[in-house]
Amino acid sequence: MRRGDIYTAAARGAYTGKPRPVLIIQDDRFDATASVTVVPFTTSDTDAPLLRIRIEPTPATGLSTVSSLMIDKVTTVPRSSLTHRVGRLAETDMVRTDRALLVFLGIAG
């Protein structure tokens, strides 16, 4: 389980109320924790470029349809709720995600 991996999260919490893919954004150095910080995906089409990062389905991501990362729904879930690895986000998409998170969280300045 590494930063940039896409897993299916079991149904838990307000934004993971149904099984859905999530992107692991937590640094790999914290792999001993019981929980992991993720950004959930949605297939709903919302025109909010700062809050939704559109990801095309590819064999590498394992996504079956165009999906968007919900930048405004960062959450922490138990590692045990991540059922299986779906794929991995491309480095270019990870950079886009990191930039959006910096802006959303107010870290970018």
UniProtKB/Swiss-Prot annotation:
Protein induction: Constitutively expressed during exponential growth and early stationary phase, it decreases in late stationary phase; part of the mazE-mazF operon. Negatively autoregulated by one or both of MazE-MazF.
Record's keyword annotation contains Nuclease: yes
Gene3D superfamilies in alphabetical order: 2.30.30.110
Function: Toxic component of a type II toxin-antitoxin (TA) system. Upon overexpression inhibits cell growth and colony formation. Its toxic effect is neutralized by coexpression with cognate antitoxin MazE. In M.smegmatis 3 TA systems (VapB-VapC, MazE-MazF and Phd-Doc) may be involved in monitoring the nutritional supply and physiological state of the cell, linking catabolic with anabolic reactions. Probably an endoribonuclease.
Protein name listed in UniProt: Probable endoribonuclease MazF
Family note: Belongs to the PemK/MazF family.
Keywords, alphabetical: Endonuclease, Hydrolase, Nuclease, Repressor, Toxin-antitoxin system, Transcription, Transcription regulation
Record note on disruption phenotype: The mazE-mazF operon is not essential. A triple TA mutant (missing vapB-vapC, mazE-mazF and phd-doc TA systems) survives antibiotic challenge, suggesting the TA systems are not required to generate drug-resistant cells. However the mutant is more sensitive to oxidative and heat stress, and does not survive long term starvation during aerobic growth on complex medium. There is a difference in the level of branched-chain amino acids, which may play a role in monitoring the nutritional supply and physiological state of the cell.
Top class in the EC scheme: hydrolase
Top-rank taxon: Bacteria
GO biological process per UniProt: mRNA catabolic process; rRNA catabolic process
An MF annotation (GO) of this entry: RNA endonuclease activity
Keyword Nuclease: yes
Disulphides: none
InterPro entries according to UniProt: PemK-like, Plasmid_toxin/cell-grow_inhib
Pfam families, A to Z: PemK_toxin
Quaternary structure annotation from Swiss-Prot or TrEMBL: Forms a complex with cognate antitoxin MazE.
EC number in record: 3.1.-.-
Species of provenance: Mycolicibacterium smegmatis (strain ATCC 700084 / mc(2)155)
